[in-house]
């Protein structure tokens, strides 16, 4: 019956989990590394490295760089899905760091900085992208 059909389907499926990602392409106004948190400059729509210790513009994360790109090159910005990275603790929430393009499991707490949740670690090497708007700390 139905149960056997599900078992048969499971047996024929590949063993690897495939994660769907979605994003968009944009020109980089500075060099970006793979996995860097990015913001879109309001003046021209080009993307660069986001940071929690900058302006509201710089703290508004639009996604993560899928691959490293140089200034003037088009970078694919991942906005939904799973970002392959390293150094994570599974289950921990992650926030935009005060340094350019970085993320941290320790949320910023200094007045004048922005608190920006960007996702949650599903494993030590995968970040589930969950972008939230910045909150100015006072």
Ranges and model annotations:
Residues 2-138:
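Glycine-anchored, exposed beta-strand/edge motif detector
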